[in-house]
């Protein structure tokens, strides 16, 4: 299940003309703040780009942190989209986001299949971290 905030972002993206979609992706990339000092990030080795993630649960809400080089705006945009879903949601809602949540919304035209597999791996890594946080 795709959380409402993420679904709304995906629907907006799908409704835009193709020439505006890259602009919207860059806006999502710009929304990704640097992780706070001391947050231990895990590298997503399946990604070609150095992509580091961290998820935890505080106050019943999922918190997500990312580090993506500025030289990788499409990967950073995907991180920005991920923040629209599991971040701030209940752990259960975050765990329900399917790895291929982006399919059918036009994102396939912006990411290569190899990159999409890496980004799906990032979501799965985040979900594993949420599960671990729930059992700690």
Feature annotation, model-predicted:
Residues 10, 80-83:
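Amphipathic alpha-helical segments within well-ordered protein domains
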Residues 80, 96-99, 124:
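A generic structural signal for well-ordered alpha-helical surface patches
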Residues 71-79, 91-94, 119:
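Short, charged, low-complexity patches
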């Amino acid at each position: 299940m795709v959380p409402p905030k993420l679904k709304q972002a995906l629907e907006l993206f799908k409704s835009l003309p193709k020439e505006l979609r890259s602009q919207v992706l860059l806006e999502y990339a710009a929304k990704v703040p640097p992780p706070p000092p001391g947050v231990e990030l895990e590298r997503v080795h399946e990604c070609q780009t150095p992509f580091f993630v961290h998820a935890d649960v505080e106050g019943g809400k999922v918190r997500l942190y990312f580090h993506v080089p500025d030289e990788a705006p499409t990967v950073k945009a995907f991180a920005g989209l991920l923040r629209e879903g599991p971040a701030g949601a209940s752990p259960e809602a975050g765990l329900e986001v399917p790895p291929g949540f982006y399919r059918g919304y036009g994102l396939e035209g912006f990411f290569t299949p190899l990159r999409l597999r890496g980004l799906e791996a990032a979501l799965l890594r985040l979900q594993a971290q949420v599960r671990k946080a729930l059992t700690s």
